[in-house]
Amino acid sequence: MAKDIQFSEEARRSMLKGVDTLANAVKVTLGPKGRNVVLEKKFGSPLITNDGVTIAKEIELEDAFENMGAKLVAEVASKTNDIAGDGTTTATVLAQAMIREGLKNVTSGANPMGIRKGIEKATAAAVKELKAISKPIEGRESIAQVAAISSADEEVGQIIAEAMERVGNDGVITIEESKGFSTELEVVEGMQFDRGYASPYMVSDSDKMEAVLDNPYVLITDKKITNIQEVLPVLEQVVQQSRPVLIIAEDVEGEALATLVLNKLRGTFNAVAVKAPGFGDRRKAMLEDIAILTGGQVITEDLGLDLKSATIESLGRAAKVVVTKENTTIVEGAGDPEQISGRVNQLKAQVEETTSEFDKEKLQERLAKLAGGVAVLKVGAATETEMKERKLRIEDALNSTRAAVEEGIVAGGGTALVNVIKAVKAVDATGDEATGVNIVLRALEEPVRQIAHNAGLEGSIIVEKLKAEEVGVGYNAATGEYVNMVETGILDPVKVTRSALQNAASVSAMFLTTEAVIADKPEENAGGADMGGMGGMGGGMPGMM
């Protein structure tokens, strides 16, 4: 296919249009007086949201060069979301500011490589200062404040704080849709381990890329399954029950995996395969934990058991299993409460006895998974549109709170970024590197300016006043007052602010050093040719192979 190529100034200008289009759509959502964005959906009602990454992912531009610029900034939002789970709008605002300022200087003749070094130096200094002015998060009230700021809802803040109190800061918290109008917390017994599905074709929800099994059987073995004949007898018994099955094995590959995927796609049989968690002896112990939790049995040659002779009685059961690319969560296993309690006490005793810090940490992880349970936040709303929007906000709030527990908190509302300006000004740089530092200095003001703009105020006046105030004093756009942000409960997790800044700086530096952009040339008669009629699909749907 022929290509279109643009060079230097022309290329960067085209991409900048895309950057501005995406960033302008995202940044209207920033701050307590930020607005919403409505996204068209092919099916069902439109989605109304103020979640930066959700908006960024939806934007596709007709011009290929502009679209590449938009996708670069969407990558900033997506990466920040992956690392910190929140802060995507801030990251987008920072990236746009750095790119616009940088482009002015490159157009004036500055060396992009020198600017890049300056941006990297300034970002490193800003991150170091952010960590220096941060405070550890302490107590339920602080956790509730972080969650409330992220979701713009005090009730959500309290619910998330309670959930973390019930299952621990590292506990498993999932978010589901409720049939009622209110948002409630429910703690159910469950276990999560860090292994995902063996094939993406096993997913049942393509939007979230997760496989959800309701009321499944659980087959647990320490063997590698390569031939479907090994598990066919027990799978046929499961098929007769018309229930799905989760297969936990050392590995599922080759013909066995292909057959499971094929039958899943045909709708004949719903099975999801995952690798067993852990390694060596720890793997055997974790499989035993899962077996006790689900009321099943580990099919292992150590006990003289063979897959071919396994029956449905040796399988575990659960109310629900959710499998993502990286994790598997088993909810409400059907195990005997006495056996589960006995296993928990056994693990507690092992924690007391072991002298190895590593072993102690791993035992405590297993104990938390077995005894901690899973907190389920059931999101309710009057309409489906409101529910989706509320669910996205709660997901952001939960991620933000976890990030705060992990690395601490700083003043929110863009205040912390203004507070680090003094440290960035002290960076030793000359020439084009100094220009790069100045680009970051200007960008650090942008979140406060945008929050003020969304509240109908002049941002530059507020920024200058904040520079003269002591560290931690910021502008509360909700009330129009200058307050100590931490004491007022307007907080941002360090991890969120840091990730937003680092990702914005990274993409901006790459953008400014771009000298050529290559895109596919659009075909003149694309879609012009008529498609012939599709022949009928022969053959019925055979049963399991």
UniProtKB/Swiss-Prot annotation:
A single Gene Ontology molecular function, please?
ATP binding
Q: Which superkingdom is the protein from? A: Bacteria
Entry-linked SUPFAM superfamilies = GroEL apical domain-like, GroEL equatorial domain-like, GroEL-intermediate domain like
Q: What class of enzyme is it?
A: isomerase
Cell compartment(s), UniProt? Cytoplasm
- Keywords from the named record: ATP-binding, Chaperone, Cytoplasm, Isomerase, Nucleotide-binding
Write one Pfam family the protein is assigned to.
Cpn60_TCP1
The record's principal subcellular location, in a coarse class, is cytoplasm
Query: Which Enzyme Commission number(s) are on file for it?
Result: 5.6.1.7
InterPro entries named in the record: Chaperonin_Cpn60_CS, Cpn60/GroEL, Cpn60/GroEL/TCP-1, GroEL-like_apical_dom_sf, GROEL-like_equatorial_sf, TCP-1-like_intermed_sf
Gene Ontology annotations of biological process type: protein refolding
Q: What positions does the entry give for ATP binding?
A: 29-32, 86-90, 413, 476-478, 492
Q: Say which family it is in.
A: Belongs to the chaperonin (HSP60) family.
Function field: Together with its co-chaperonin GroES, plays an essential role in assisting protein folding. The GroEL-GroES system forms a nano-cage that allows encapsulation of the non-native substrate proteins and provides a physical environment optimized to promote and accelerate protein folding.
Please identify the protein, giving its name as recorded: Chaperonin GroEL
Provenance organism:
Shouchella clausii (strain KSM-K16) (Alkalihalobacillus clausii)
Q: Which gene encodes it?
A: groEL
